């Protein structure tokens, strides 16, 4: 049963469907379909969100807070995410890293559905260094932001063996070990990213928004006029 609502934008409201000590389930209303996010806090300022989307467009952020580091992984479907005047695309297995903007535009889902994960790190609330959780994990959120998001850049890479290993296990975590397992996997992910080669970025996954909008308009026109010759 829905327990609370708050406005995300003029067109989107966030409804809390379920909440307990370990996770919160949100429904994002105001879309042309169904969008559900299941969010688990892992460490102070660090959370993991599972997205189950059956819609063509939706605002993915539940708050207007800016500055957070977001690590997006696509498991199924497609996502087109506007960012910095451009738009990046993720297909199954792809990974993107961005720094959240308070004025982010809604994401689009060309196939009408999307399933994936976002790991969010709020540098204002997260520890300066994650070695406080596990010795020798010398990873600083500020250093990851500088590495992947310098000059408002968006880092996108195709699936690799390392990325697939980390995220495939996050989609099938037994409930009984979920809380501790998330902590281990998030530390593994961030340590992995701290050593990730920047040359693995895929700049061709990003396109100007004007080009994306034109392609969407052409696609919509063709769908509306399929019987015309």
Predicted regions and their residues:
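A short, N-terminal "cap"/entry segment at the start of jelly-roll beta-barrel domains
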Residues: 1-41
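Amphipathic alpha-helical segments enriched in hydrophobic/aromatic residues interleaved with Lys/Arg
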Residues: 136-185
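N-terminal positioning helix adjacent to the helix-turn-helix/winged-helix DNA-binding module
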Residues: 162, 207-218
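Basic, amphipathic alpha-helical hairpins
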Residues: 167-181, 190-203, 217-229
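Conserved strand-loop elements at the edges of beta-sheets that form or border functional pockets
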Residues: 42, 184, 225
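N-terminal regulatory/effector-sensing and dimerization cores
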Residues: 26-141
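Short, well-structured alpha-helical interface segments that form or flank functional binding sites
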Residues: 46, 66-69, 177, 181-184, ...
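Short, well-ordered coil↔helix boundary/capping segments
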Residues: 157, 209-212, 229
């Amino acid at each position: 049963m829905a327990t609370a609502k708050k406005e995300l934008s003029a067109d989107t409201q966030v409804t809390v469907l379920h909440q307990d000590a370990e996770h919160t389930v949100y429904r994002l209303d105001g879309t042309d379909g169904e969008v559900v996010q299941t969010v688990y806090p892992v460490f102070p300022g660090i959370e993991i969100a599972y997205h189950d989307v059956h819609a063509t467009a939706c605002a993915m952020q539940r708050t207007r807070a800016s500055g957070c580091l977001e690590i997006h992984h696509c498991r199924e479907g497609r996502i087109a995410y506007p960012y910095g005047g451009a738009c990046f695309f993720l297909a199954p297995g792809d990974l993107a890293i961005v720094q959240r903007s308070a004025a982010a535009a809604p994401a689009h889902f060309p196939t009408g559905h999307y399933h994936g994960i976002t790991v969010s790190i709020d540098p204002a609330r997260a520890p300066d260094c994650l070695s406080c959780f596990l010795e020798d994990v010398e990873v600083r959120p500020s250093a990851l932001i500088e590495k992947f998001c310098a000059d408002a850049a968006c880092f996108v890479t195709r699936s690799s063996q390392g990325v697939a290993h980390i995220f495939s296990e996050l989609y099938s975590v037994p409930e009984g070990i979920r809380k501790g397992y998330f902590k281990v996997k998030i530390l593994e992910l961030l340590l992995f990213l701290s050593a990730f080669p920047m040359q693995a970025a895929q700049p061709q996954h990003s396109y100007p928004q004007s080009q994306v909008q034109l392609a969407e308009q052409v696609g919509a026109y063709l769908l509306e006029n399929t019987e015309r010759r």
